[in-house]
C-alpha cells in the first residue's frame, strides 16, 4: 500500500493540485507540441495532467505507485489512456523501452528515492530524440525542503545523457502567505557520444 493512497479520494478536489496541473499543462504545451505523441505520465496521481493531455496525445500510459490514485483515474474512462498501478523501475519497465515520445513527471522527482536512477530509466523508455519534462519545487542551495536547485537538475541531466533544452522557473504557487516557485526542466535524449539517437 502506498502512502499516497490516503489522499486519493480528495486529490481531485484540492485547489493546489488543480492549479498546479493546469499551470504544468500550460507551460508544457507552450514548449512542446503534444499532438499525436505517445506519452508516459510518471507519478500521475489521479490523472489531473493526463486529463488535460489526452485529447492531443496518440496514447498515454499513466503510472503511479498508489493503487487508489490509479483507481480514481481508471474510473474516469479516458480514451487512449492506460492507467497502471505500478512502482515503475528499471526491471519492470523493460517492455516499455523506446516507447515514448514524451515523459512527464509533475511534482514527483523530488520524492523519488533515487532521482538519477529514475532519469536513467526514463532515458531507456524514450524513443530517439524523445523529451523528458519535470516540474518540482525550486529550492535554494542549502535548503532541506523537497525540491531541486537548477544546478542539481542540470547535473543530473548531464550525468544521465540528456541534453538540457530548458531549465527555468515556470510558475509560482500560493501556499499560505508564500509564493513558492516551481522549476520546469526540459531535456532531450541523446546517445552515448553526445549526439541524438
Show where each model-derived region lies.
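Core SAM-dependent methyltransferase catalytic element
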Residues: 174-197
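Conserved class I S-adenosyl-L-methionine
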Residues: 1-34, 72, 140
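Short alpha-helix
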Residues: 146-161
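A short SAM/SAH-binding and catalytic strip from SAM-dependent methyltransferases
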Residues: 102-114
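A short glycine-rich, Lys/Arg-flanked "PGG" loop and its adjoining helix->strand segment in the class I
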Residues: 117-128
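Class I SAM-dependent methyltransferase SAM/SAH-binding core
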Residues: 46-91
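A short acidic, Gly/Pro-enriched loop at the edge of an enzyme's catalytic core
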Residues: 93-103
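Conserved beta-strand signature within the Rossmann-like core of class I S-adenosyl-L-methionine
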Residues: 130-137
Amino acid at each position: 500500500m502506498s502512502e499516497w493512497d490516503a489522499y486519493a479520494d480528495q486529490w481531485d478536489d484540492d485547489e493546489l493540485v488543480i492549479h498546479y496541473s493546469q499551470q504544468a499543462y500550460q507551460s508544457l504545451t507552450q514548449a512542446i507540441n503534444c499532438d499525436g505523441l505517445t506519452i508516459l505520465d510518471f507519478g500521475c496521481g489521479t490523472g489531473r495532467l493526463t486529463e488535460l493531455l489526452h485529447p492531443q496525445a496518440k496514447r498515454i500510459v499513466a503510472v503511479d505507485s498508489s493503487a487508489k490514485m490509479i483507481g480514481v483515474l481508471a474510473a474516469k474512462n479516458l480514451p487512449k489512456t492506460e492507467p497502471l498501478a505500478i512502482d515503475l523501475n528499471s526491471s519492470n519497465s523493460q517492455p516499455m523501452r523506446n516507447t515514448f515520445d514524451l515523459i512527464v513527471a509533475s511534482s514527483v522527482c523530488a520524492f523519488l528515492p533515487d532521482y538519477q536512477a529514475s532519469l536513467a530509466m526514463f532515458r531507456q523508455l524514450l524513443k530517439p530524440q524523445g523529451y523528458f519534462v519535470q516540474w518540482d519545487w525550486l529550492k535554494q542551495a542549502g535548503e532541506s525542503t523537497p525540491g531541486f536547485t537548477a544546478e542539481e537538475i542540470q547535473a543530473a541531466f548531464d550525468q544521465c545523457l540528456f541534453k538540457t533544452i530548458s531549465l527555468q522557473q515556470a510558475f509560482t504557487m500560493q501556499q499560505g502567505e508564500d509564493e513558492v516557485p516551481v522549476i520546469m526542466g526540459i531535456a532531450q535524449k541523446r546517445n552515448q557520444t553526445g549526439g541524438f539517437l
